[in-house]
């Protein structure tokens, strides 16, 4: 059972540590996002890219990455979803990075948190599918192209969609838990010097898991809004 500094707050304890950590990540994400927005300036300064390494430059780089990914996965409609998916990516990344602080555990290693993210994605892509195609046309996505196989395909598709929030949540929670466990073990054994490579690996894992979650969510949206021809 990993220690979390938030457990010292009265009423939090181990059971609600992930909720407290999620709250910290939310405040941090909003604060850093506001600082990055303020650094844009006004007029031409807001349009020109950052000329040096800065918080603004980091946000521009990651937003450009999200934009390119949306264009590649979703297509011409991808630009409409950039604000949403950029927010998802940054928020999950902030939650993951909190686990790199000694004495903190990321909210994303708790299945309750990651399943909540998965349910959000499930509701979002289905809503976009119905909005783009209409209820009847969207339901046809579940039936496949062969009429006599439609009942079987409908059941299979429904099950696969129901499983998606669990698969998204399990993947993120298990990987983050494993990474944090490895880092914690080496910090306990040799607290100086040796854990540095594991911190580097942890940073990579934090980024990759936020990227994978965002990528899979984009794929689900792309399939949901696709028009059958």
UniProtKB/Swiss-Prot annotation:
Q: What is its main location?
A: membrane
Which GO terms of the molecular function aspect are on file? proton-transporting ATP synthase activity, rotational mechanism
What processes does the entry annotate via GO biological process terms? proton motive force-driven plasma membrane ATP synthesis
Q: Which UniProt keywords apply?
A: ATP synthesis, Cell inner membrane, Cell membrane, CF(0), Hydrogen ion transport, Ion transport, Membrane, Transmembrane, Transmembrane helix, Transport
| GO cellular component, as recorded | plasma membrane; proton-transporting ATP synthase complex
Question: InterPro entries given for it?
Answer: ATP_syn_F0_a_bact/chloroplast (IPR045082), ATP_synth_F0_asu (IPR000568), F0_ATP_A_sf (IPR035908)
Which Pfam family is one of this chain's hits?
A: ATP-synt_A
Q: Where in the cell is it found?
A: Cell inner membrane
Looking at the UniProt entry, the stretches that span the membrane are 16-36, 81-101, 110-130, 142-162, 175-195, 196-216
Membrane topology field: Multi-pass membrane protein
Residues in a coiled coil are none
Entry's family note: Belongs to the ATPase A chain family.
Q: Which HAMAP family match?
A: ATP_synth_a_bact
Described by its record, this protein's role is as follows:
Key component of the proton channel; it plays a direct role in the translocation of protons across the membrane.
How is the quaternary structure described?
F-type ATPases have 2 components, CF(1) - the catalytic core - and CF(0) - the membrane proton channel. CF(1) has five subunits: alpha(3), beta(3), gamma(1), delta(1), epsilon(1). CF(0) has three main subunits: a(1), b(2) and c(9-12). The alpha and beta chains form an alternating ring which encloses part of the gamma chain. CF(1) is attached to CF(0) by a central stalk formed by the gamma and epsilon chains, while a peripheral stalk is formed by the delta and b chains.
Could you tell me what this protein is called?
A: ATP synthase subunit a
Query: From which lineage does this chain's organism come?
Result: Bacteria, Pseudomonadati, Bdellovibrionota, Bdellovibrionia, Bdellovibrionales
């Amino acid at each position: 059972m990993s220690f979390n500094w938030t457990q010292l707050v009265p009423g939090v304890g181990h059971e609600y540590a992930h909720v407290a950590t999620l709250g910290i990540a939310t405040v941090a994400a909003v604060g850093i996002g506001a600082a990055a927005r303020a650094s844009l300036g006004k007029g031409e300064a807001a349009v020109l890219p950052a000329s040096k390494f800065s918080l603004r430059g980091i946000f521009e780089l990651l937003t450009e990455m999200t934009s390119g990914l949306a264009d590649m996965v979703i297509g011409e409609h991808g630009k409409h979803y950039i604000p949403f998916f950029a927010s998802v990516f940054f928020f999950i990344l902030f939650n993951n990075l909190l686990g790199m602080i000694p004495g903190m555990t990321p909210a994303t290693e708790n299945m309750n948190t990651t399943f909540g993210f998965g349910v959000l994605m499930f509701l979002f892509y289905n809503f976009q599918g119905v909005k783009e195609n209409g209820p009847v046309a969207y339901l046809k996505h579940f039936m496949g192209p062969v009429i006599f196989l439609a009942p079987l395909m409908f059941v299979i598709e429904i099950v696969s969609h129901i499983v998606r929030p669990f698969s998204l949540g399990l993947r993120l929670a298990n990987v983050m838990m494993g990474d944090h466990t490895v880092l914690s073990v080496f910090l306990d054994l040799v607290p100086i010097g040796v854990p540095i490579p594991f911190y580097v690996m942890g940073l990579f894992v934090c980024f990759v898991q936020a990227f994978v979650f965002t990528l899979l969510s984009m794929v689900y949206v792309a399939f949901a809004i696709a028009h059958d021809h």
